[in-house]
Amino acid sequence: MHIKNLTDGYTCSAQISKDELKHLHEQGVKSVICFRPDGEHPEQPEFDTLTREASELGLVCYYLPYDVAQVSAELMQQMHRIIEEAPKPAHAFCK
């Protein structure tokens, strides 16, 4: 997993796995934000699967799936709200 540090307390990467959730937890991440729609790729774990694993680790999960064709001011406001309220450090992932 290649993690990019975007700001203090906020990182991102491509799709994560259940094992990578454990790694993020070990690194001190407190919340995970998923911007990827379920079913985008056959090998992609469903968000519910990741949520169950994350909950067992004590991570807070947020789900705001979108397609780039659907980007709007409303979506950006929702994204901003989630990023602001998510316990830090937070990690977001997409495709």
Describe each model-derived feature in a short phrase:
Residues 94:
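Short cysteine clusters
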Residues 1-91:
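Cys-dependent protein tyrosine phosphatase-like superfamily
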